[in-house]
A protein has these predicted regions:
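Bacterial Sec-dependent N-terminal signal peptides
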Residues: 1-26
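Glycan-recognition and catalytic cores of secretory/periplasmic carbohydrate-active enzymes
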Residues: 24-575
Length: 575
């Protein structure tokens, strides 16, 4: 067992990996476990994890790597995949794939996944070594485009840059994949590759003025500011933090600093990764203003612009916060990538606050949106989840579908162990999500046994590896859906007084081998209106959004082909 605490939050475990980092950083209120210390046990989440392994292994890595080999002037071993992988966004799934393999290997120890990870990383290294200057990217004819950028020729649009399809967004996936291979899967060579690629970007943009940089950032660019901040934390070099600032989009940041909602009409998932970067930079610099800006964005999106499943946006854009009519009627409802990124932002915010309200949102979005975006039979992923009553979703297929939400989907179901538990030092353990799982924590093992949400509660069993007692406080999250005074607690079958503080049931004692705590959390039926108060209600039981069984007629294209718009439900709008 290796316990790697996370001083910085998010996906990362940077403080434990870099205890001598030169950068001052915000002290977290809670710390996260290495995902390899957590194992899922039998549940819908474990099934989703298993299905994701099958999907990952069904993909041909040489086809995903083909754009990278072409970019390095090497002969590909196979043709590109179709769909978005050969129509301009070539290589974006390769970066997601590297991240997903890293998380899945850490989460399961699956040896075939580990071998696949090492192969993909070695081929990417071959491409980077051949390039000779740190470059690693699958953007078609990318060298020509990047040379134009280096020379100050910037032609930016929302979904394009110098006649390419969002190349900054594309290369961000490679940065994130290398970061995750290093920090999550502990592949040391990925660190060197990540730094070389960052140095290349620094040189490429060195001569651009601040005005040119901000103009370029009009083009969707993922979370490049976050990844450059990560490199700063990994290396302790403030030079990379300056680069992170250069890649921070001021037209989004400035209204947030003023606590202003200027989101209506803009592409939703373009903005969320930027805000993750603002928060990441804030934590490294102890910048309270940027942290408040990120929290304001979260509050605005969650409270004013999201529906009960935790998703947001219609046709990929933020609609007016006072009019959810398009949400109710469109076949292009909340996008999976948006919620994927909102959960990543939530993780950062929770770590520096330990405020359970963040976990209430996390639970709702994870159970109702993310888990449901995987076909439980064939493992395909969903792009849009329509809120139109009686409509349907479209599922990806491994050999035909390579949208952005396939990339985030590959990652989603490998990451369920991230937020189940947290700790503060060696004497505070937090149980945040009620998902059957085990945790290795120093000299003790924790088992969480539950069939939640079919069961209105959860049990925690403590096992001592050395047979010795351990004194610590066990903190069980009190969900917002539990009525005041209804939660009850037993230890080894004996009813105990419930002590609630800061959103948690707190049980401080010397725990011995075999101790079993059970928390009962009664659930109730309730109705929640849309944020525009239009009297369009969802019914929930506890945190679970309910749905009625309806007809299955005319669900055209439920399993996507390789067409450019194959992710959109093409059938008639029913009813």
């Amino acid at each position: 067992m290796k316990l790697i605490t996370q001083k910085l939050v998010g996906l990362l475990f940077l403080a434990a990996l870099n205890p001598t980092t030169a950068l001052a950083q915000t002290e977290p209120k809670v710390e996260y476990f290495d995902i390899s210390d957590v194992r899922l046990t039998r549940s819908a989440f474990k099934h989703a994890e298993d299905m994701d392994i099958q999907y990952l292994l069904a993909l041909n890595p040489d086809r995903l790597l083909a754009p990278y080999l072409k970019g390095a002037g090497l002969e590909p071993k196979a043709d590109n995949y179709p769909n978005w992988e050969n129509t301009g966004l070539d290589g974006h799934i390769g970066g997601h794939y590297l991240s997903a393999l890293s998380f899945m290997y850490a989460a399961t120890g699956n040896e075939e996944i580990g071998r696949r990870l090492d192969y993909v990383l070695s081929e990417m290294k071959r491409c980077q070594d051949t390039a000779g200057d740190g470059y690693l990217c699958g953007v078609p004819d990318g060298r020509k485009m990047w040379k134009e950028i280096e020379q100050g020729n910037v032609r930016a649009a929302t979904f394009g840059l110098n006649d390419r399809w969002v190349p900054l967004y594309n290369i961000h996936k490679t940065y994130a994949g290398l970061r995750d291979a290093y920090l999550v899967a502990h592949r040391e060579e990925a660190k060197d590759m990540l730094i070389k690629l960052t140095d290349w970007m620094e040189r490429t943009t060195a001569n651009l003025t601040d005005e040119q940089m901000q103009d370029m950032l009009r083009s969707e660019h993922g979370g490049l500011n976050e990844t450059f901040a990560d490199v700063a934390a990994i290396t302790g070099n403030k030079r990379y933090l300056k680069l992170a600032h250069r890649f921070s989009h001021e037209i989004i940041l400035n209204p947030l600093l003023k606590q202003e909602d200027k989101l209506t009409g803009i592409h939703a998932n373009t903005q969320i990764p930027k805000v993750i970067g603002f928060k990441r930079i804030a934590d490294i610099e102890k910048n309270n203003e940027w942290s408040k800006a990120a929290d304001f964005f979260w509050q605005t999106v969650v409270n004013n612009r999201s529906i009960t499943i935790g998703g947001n946006s219609v046709y990929e854009h933020f609609h007016p916060a006072d009019n959810f009519e398009s949400m109710r009627t469109s076949e292009q409802g909340p996008e999976t990538c948006n919620t994927y990124n909102m959960l990543r932002l939530t993780k950062l915010l929770y770590a520096t606050s330990a405020n359970s309200r963040y976990m209430d949102y996390y639970e709702r979005a994870l159970f109702n949106h993310i888990l449901s975006t995987q076909d439980p039979v064939q493992g395909g992923f969903v792009y849009f989840t329509p809120m139109r009553s009686g409509h349907y979703r479209v599922y990806s297929q491994p050999q035909t579908s390579f949208w952005c939400c396939v990339g985030s989907g590959l990652e989603n179901h490998a990451r369920y162990g991230e937020m189940i538990y947290a700790h503060k030092g060696n004497d505070q353990l937090y149980v945040n999500l009620f998902i059957p799982s085990t945790l290795e924590w120093g000299d003790i093992n924790i088992e969480q046994s539950t069939s939640f949400p079919d069961e209105e509660g959860t049990s925690v069993i403590v096992t001592s590896k050395k047979g010795k007692n351990k004194k610590f406080t066990l903190n069980i999250r009190v969900p917002e859906w539990v009525n005041e005074g209804e939660l009850s607690l037993t230890i080894n079958g004996k009813t105990e007084k419930v002590n609630i503080a800061d959103g948690y049931v707190k049980v401080n004692r010397s725990w011995k081998d075999g101790d079993k705590l059970h928390v009962s959390m009664p659930m109730h039926l309730r109705a929640i209106d849309m944020p525009d108060h239009s009297h369009n209600y969802s019914f929930l039981y506890g945190p679970i959004v309910l749905a009625s069984r309806m007809g299955t007629q005319r669900q055209d294209g439920m399993f996507a082909d390789d067409s450019r718009g194959g992710h959109i439900a093409q059938g008639p709008r029913l009813p």
